[in-house]
UniProtKB/Swiss-Prot annotation:
Superkingdom of origin organism: Eukaryota
Stated family: Belongs to the NADH dehydrogenase family.
Listed GO CC annotations: mitochondrial inner membrane; mitochondrial matrix; mitochondrion; peroxisome
Protein name stated in the entry: Internal alternative NAD(P)H-ubiquinone oxidoreductase A2, mitochondrial
Length: 508
């Protein structure tokens, strides 16, 4: 079945977990050990193909309900801002933590645009889950599963999951169940395409590290292809036309980084094409609508100086080499980045749970899903129910982070009150409900310029500023917000080397 050499020690608690994880001599035990214990130096895993085809594979794996004497289990779906902040704050003396996510790291999204052009390296914005919550890799009852959740059975207190694989030389997609005492849905949202034809096939989003990698490779490929002998002037201009759809902070920051890259690096290292490369930002309404008019006008002025062209219009169709606006204008492009906001994911839409007016999972002031026991939702996938009388909070990192922190403290209080087990917290006083206070907004626009607005809203009184000082505040603030000292060091070193030597334009 399996063989592990040089395994240091398996504690009695670990042995009990393994015994319960194993059903009928299945290969799930070997799968668990291979993914769970970093001290295993050699592992041989039984192929799932040996299981008879007429047998339901889901019976071969799963985490059963916790027993008396074991810690209650908190299952977290997602590894974004909300889920990771919750896992960081949860008391692992009270709970076992199981995280289910299609990625094993958290992405520091405010700096993701900088990785697209080589200002920062990709590892600078990715923090492993095992560093955020060490119990995931150390405690016998805590796990991380690289998987997607496909179904919620709230009556049975179970989630149904399916492993994420490459479909080639690893395991075939493997279905399993996890019983929970407390479930936290923090699965985030997906990019909104508004049903526009061709967006999914031709545009690149900017929400994950692999998106930034794809943008960087595509950008550098187009730069090199445009210098090919014999290429027409028209085709060269198309290849070097970078189009950004969406004038929110992500779209504006990426446009600023891209224009900065063109002015400082492309013109020095790709002198033959420096006059043909340009950036166009398309927005249906005003850019940076969350900022006041003064800050928006400053951003437009600075981006225009950097060569960014603004087009007001609605995209109606996206083809492989051009997009078409509502007035019939055709815009050829070589790189298309789509940044038009987010909406509920297919998983969230599939759940038979109450929804808020925007289609997100409906919650009350304590992050609970009122219609089911022991289920909470935080981050971009959740919003207040209309019955609470509260408006839906914006899909921002600072909202998700503070919801995660609040819920971690709430679950810790519930656990200390002996309410950690399933269906045991009905009579526990939950305390003060969650209250969100906006701390302000920031956006960089390139060329050592940024916008900083420290007011609760764009119409309130307070501090707002622009220019170099704002850029310095923006960098300082985000450097301190990077989760680990390791990544802070990476970010600081990357900024320094970029300033001294320029951006890395290697296409690897």
């Amino acid at each position: 079945m399996f063989m592990i050499k040089n395994l240091t020690r398996i504690s009695p608690n670990t042995s009990s977990i393994i015994t319960r994880f194993r059903n009928s001599g299945s290969s799930s035990l070997s799968y668990t050990l291979a993914s769970r214990f970093c001290t295993a130096q050699e592992t041989q895993i039984q192929s799932p193909a040996k299981i008879p085809n007429d047998v339901d594979r889901s019976q071969y794996s799963g985490l059963p309900p916790t027993r008396e004497g074991e810690k209650p289990r908190v299952v977290v779906l997602g590894s974004g801002w909300a889920g990771c902040r919750l896992m960081k704050g949860i008391d692992t003396n009270l709970y076992d933590v199981v995280c289910v996510s299609p990625r094993n790291h958290m992405v520091f999204t405010p700096l993701l645009a900088s990785t697209c052009v080589g200002t920062l390296e990709f590892r600078s914005v990715a923090e492993p889950i095992s560093r955020i919550q060490p119990a995931i890799s150390r405690e016998p009852g805590s796990f991380f599963f690289l998987a997607n959740c496909s179904r919620l059975d709230a009556d049975a207190h179970e989630v149904h999951c399916e492993t994420l694989t490459d479909g080639l030389n690893t395991l075939k997609p493997w279905k399993f169940k996890i019983a929970y005492d407390k479930l936290v849905i923090a699965s985030g949202a997906e990019a909104s395409t508004f049903g526009i034809h061709g967006v999914m096939e031709n545009a690149i989003f900017l929400r994950e590290v692999h998106h930034a990698q794809e943008i960087r490779r595509k950008l550098l490929l187009n730069l090199m292809l445009s210098d090919t002998p014999g290429i027409s002037k028209e085709e060269k201009r198309r290849l070097l036309h970078c189009v950004v759809v969406g004038g929110g902070p992500t779209g504006v920051e990426f446009s600023g980084e891209l224009s900065d890259f063109i002015m400082k690096d492309v013109r020095q290292r790709y002198a033959h094409v420096k006059d043909d490369i340009h950036v166009t930002l398309i927005e249906a309404r005003d850019i940076l609508s969350s900022f006041d008019d003064r800050l928006r006008r400053y951003a437009i002025k600075q981006l225009n100086k950097s060569g960014v062209r603004f087009v007001r219009g609605i995209v109606k169709d996206v083809q492989s080499q051009k997009l078409i606006l509502d007035d019939g204008t055709e815009v050829p492009y070589g790189l298309l980045v789509w940044s038009t906001g987010v909406g509920p994911s297919p998983f969230v839409r599939s759940l038979g749970l109450p929804k808020d007016p925007t289609g997100r999972i409906g919650i009350d002031e304590w992050m609970r899903v009122p219609s089911v026991q022991d289920v909470f939702a935080i981050g971009d996938c959740s919003g207040y129910l209309e019955t609470t009388g509260k408006p839906t909070l914006p899909a921002l990192a600072q909202v998700a982070e503070r919801e995660g922190k609040y819920l971690a403290n709430l679950l810790n209080a519930i656990g200390k009150g002996n309410g950690g087990r399933a269906n045991s917290a009905k009579e526990i006083e939950l305390g003060v409900p969650f209250v969100y206070k906006h701390l302000g907004s920031m956006a960089t626009i390139g060329r050592y310029k940024a916008l900083v607005d420290l007011r609760e809203s764009k119409d309130a009184k307070g501090i707002s500023m622009t220019g170099f000082v704002s850029w310095f505040i923006w960098r300082s603030a985000y450097l301190t917000r990077v989760i680990s000292w390791r990544n802070r060091f990476y970010v600081a070193i990357n900024w320094f080397t970029t300033f001294v030597f320029g951006r890395d334009i290697s296409r690897i």
